Amino acid sequence: TKHDSLKNDYEFLPRGATIALVIALITASLGIVMTTRLTIEFCTSVMVGFFLAACALHIPAIRNARFASAVGNTLAIIAILTMFAHDDILDSTLKPMLFGFGIALSSSEQLYKLLGSCDHCQRSTAESTYFLSSDGGLFLGIAAGWQLTTAVKSAEEIALGLLVVATIICSLNVLIKKKQAKHHA
């Protein structure tokens, strides 16, 4: 019946399954990196990156950008690659800021995509889908990070791989769906 179909998609938006997968991959990589580099400076710098992304998203050109998620993922990938390159003072300041900025930019773009793919009456379902996938991905990332704490480089390689897969998926989604609606914050 019609009432049963509403009950089935109350917590998860089926049309947003690929977007939810991308969100879970992004937050899983965040969880892995956060568990491998657990210092106050690193975590504070990631939060500063989140804040800078929130400020940048007030600029319409960034908020409505078609490949904002791919750009955010690329920034996070660059941050992880530079963490691999060599250890220096920037490992606890600038690199995590870049990582946090990229993760926040990409995650917010995915939320806008979820909200844009639903009807007005399904906005709370889209938000539930976002939080289920982001919290689930973060949990899996933290669990994987704690399992891999003895091998920091391999944990970061896994996080890097997750971000690459997320970038490919979100870029393909944008290329397949040529017409993208304006986002509303």
Name the predicted role of every residue range.
Residues 117-152:
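A late C-terminal transmembrane helix in Major Facilitator Superfamily
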Residues 66-110:
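C-terminal transmembrane helical hairpin of 12-TM major facilitator-type secondary transporters
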Residues 42-65, 69-72:
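Transmembrane alpha-helices of Major Facilitator/SLC transporters
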